[in-house]
Amino acid sequence: MKTGDKALVDPKLTGLETWVEGKVIDIENNPFKGVVIAIEDKDGRIFFGEEKYFKAA
């Protein structure tokens, strides 16, 4: 996954009922959490978390 790709974020991270689709806006290698991904959805909401909560759309 790279910046600009479409991705889905797990409801376990968002607290919503369904997977949310968005565009990857940042990928960071966090020394404590590993790879952390941030996406922005069509409503302008930003979700970020560990790589395990994301999948390619």
For every predicted segment, state its role.
Residues 3-56:
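Basic/aromatic-rich interaction segments and small domains that mediate binding to polyanionic partners
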